[in-house]
Amino acid sequence: MGKIIGIDLGTTNSCVSVLEGNEPIVITNSEGKRTTPSVVAFVDGGERKVGDPAKRQAITNPTKTIYSIKRFMGETYDQVSREVERVPFKVVRGDNNTPRVDIDGRLYTPQEISAMILQKMKKTAEDYLGQEVTEAVITVPAYFNDAQRQATKEAGEIAGLKVRRIVNEPTAASLAYGLDKSNKDMKIAVFDLGGGTFDISILELGDGVFEVKSTNGDTHLGGDDFDHVIIDWLAEEFKSQEGVDLRQDPMAMQRLKEAAEKAKIELSSTSSTEINLPYIMPVNGIPKHLVMTLTRAKFEQLADRLIQACVAPCETALKDAGMSRGDIDEVILVGGSTRIPAIQEIVEKIFGKAPSKGVNPDEVVAVGAAIQGGVLTGEVKDVLLLDVTPLSLGIETMGGVMTRLIDANTTIPTKKSEIFTTAVDNQPSVEIHVLQGERSLAKDNKSIGRFNLDGIAPAPRQTPQIEVTFDIDANGILNVTAHDKATGKKQNIRIEASSGLSDDEIKRMKEEAQANAEADKKEKERIDKINQADSMIFQTEKQLKELGDKFPADKKAPIDTALDKLKEAHKAQDVAAIDTAMAELQTALTAAGEELYKNVGAAQGGAQPGPDFGGAQGPSVGDQPSDDKNVTDVDFEEVK
């Protein structure tokens, strides 16, 4: 059985891990880093960059550099209107009222962009393992709804991965934290504040069982929001000084974003930081600079609303778990934003104890996902993960009311059935409107799917018996069935349409992603070949300069001809022509080297070390064995 990798698909950064000899290993990417920025850039010429290379060019290419795409996953366009206004790239309304990223007229779904990041993580794992990877455990925020979970699963499929399990991020973190403590009975709180989402989960650990008792959170609260309070402060200060709003210029906005993120990070370890952005924007033809000092106290004042927003979900989670803060043995911090001192202080205030800092907040979720992968393959034994559904599920009934079938914080997988009936006489069909949320009225909850049960036998109202069954799998994804008990007619829906993508669209996107991966591979091979040619040109010119006068004329001419041909092919970046020219140049260099070696040997009456005429990759003439008569035996004493 192949390896199942664990991927933390984050808003700001992503991380991949794998189990090696029962130990989870965080895999270093091609840039030598253990986490990869969740950034995708489209550059001129159709090239696509992912991770650090994409992030590095963001300032000069703000409208085609995509970040924080996780905040758009599984949402309708109307639900992300605030996010749309914040980002410099263009987001438009697509089919089924879904948000789409517009790059030169080509519309990309959030799932496609996320798939590009997942492909990078997949390739990172394959390079490390030396084998193809086809299966993964991918983590999501605990408070992700059904549509967001399904969108994540689709992103994995588009990336060419079979998603074996969707795991909640705090639950994965608890696995990583508690695996070596599984013989201990503990109650832990996992406080997960990442780049775009906030989760709090209360768990009980003991005898290898990791049982989630409750979960709560906010899928639109995270490090991005802390960045934006700094961005808005900088922009308003500059506007009051210069009368210009920097937020209207995409390039200036990107510079503000990077400066805000850097300042936020610095303020975790220092009491103040200087933000210095020269030539931020010309005003009346005069270039203006932005130089401001931000103190930690001012930052905490700006972010106070966000800090306080963490309190209520924690209190609700404790209440839902039937616990008080005194029952919690350990508080685990997960996500880069938990490094903010004010967040650590509020956590200590909520739970009455200092949080544990025994895990790496950037890597622990991916490590937990890899452990879950090990559970699925059988590598990790005697571990049972009992997760919960974060939100209540039900259907719309007469009067626009939501009737719950499954309550929030129910352990999954789970199945629940209820009998419903018709509202009017001789009603031929019923519409099942599936909802997710905690509000009493249907309109106030998230609509995650609709389907019809047709062919109901004519009967007076309230006579037919329609059995509606909700079935949630271990991924937290819902399957709904409606069954007319009188006629035996049955209709079911796997809630996939809520993400806005049909099976055909997913298939097309998967094929495109595979084609792009192949194109990326060919592009790398092309660049490598051009670099080889460049190296061969340099080495050949160097050798001609050093030894050219020693060549017989009839051997030097073919080298000059082949070298000129290679230079032309290199300039044109014609890979086929480069291959031919390199082969010709190699042949000419080898022939010249042999001739020169022969001449030197004849002149000196014996074999001497010959010059290297292999170009960038040719053979070298090595040192020859020396005559034994010239060898002197020497005694030596080892000094210790």
Swiss-Prot record:
SUPFAM superfamilies for the chain: Actin-like ATPase domain, Heat shock protein 70kD (HSP70), peptide-binding domain
GO molecular function: ATP binding; ATP-dependent protein folding chaperone; unfolded protein binding
UniProt biased composition (Gly residues): 603-617
Annotated region (Disordered), positions in chain: 602-640
Modification Phosphothreonine, positions: 197
Superkingdom of this protein's organism: Bacteria
Induction profile: By stress conditions e.g. heat shock.
Assigned protein family: Belongs to the heat shock protein 70 family.
Protein function: Acts as a chaperone.
Xref: NCBIfam families: PRK00290.1 (NF001413), PRK05183.1 (NF003520), prok_dnaK (TIGR02350)
HAMAP family assigned to the protein according to its UniProt record, in alphabetical order: DnaK
Name of the protein this chain belongs to: Chaperone protein DnaK
Taxonomic source organism: Porphyromonas gingivalis (strain ATCC 33277 / DSM 20709 / CIP 103683 / JCM 12257 / NCTC 11834 / 2561)
